[in-house]
Amino acid sequence: TAITRKDIAVEGEIQRIFYNNEYLGLVVRDEAKTGYQLHIYTSEGNENAVTEQDELHTGYAFQQRNIVMYDADYCEVQSFSGRIRFAREFGNTLYTVIPGDKFKTYYLATMEELQQIKLR
């Protein structure tokens, strides 16, 4: 397996970092605005996409070309272009979101249950 190293210049303060074998995600506070920018880079270090975000979430994960963002009671799945594919608030505490092995399948773990979600 080849390892690629590339320096990436970031304007603003990095708030979150998440990655998988294909992509690196950086959530950066946008100093000029009141929100955040989500930068997605390929494993070679090339910028793939940038989206504007209003909120900073607790957890982030990739599933193919989607980004899963979640907090204690909220989950959102967004495409790399920023299109919201799923957004839901939960009455229970959401511990984690696990991308499934099939495209558009996710598992949401709360204290009471494990829910499977399949997006259309």
Language model features: what each stretch is:
Residues 62, 67-69, 77:
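Periodically patterned hydrophobic/aromatic "hotspot" residues that form packing/interaction faces
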Residues 25-28, 69, 107-108:
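Residue position within the beta-strands of beta-propeller blades
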Residues 31-32, 102:
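Short strand-connecting beta-turns/loops that link adjacent beta-strands
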Residues 9-22, 52-65, 91-104:
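Repeated scaffold domains used in trafficking and secretory/extracellular systems
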Residues 97-118:
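Hydrophobic, glycine-enriched assembly/anchoring segments
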Residues 25-29, 40, 96-97:
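Long, low-complexity regulatory tails in eukaryotic proteins
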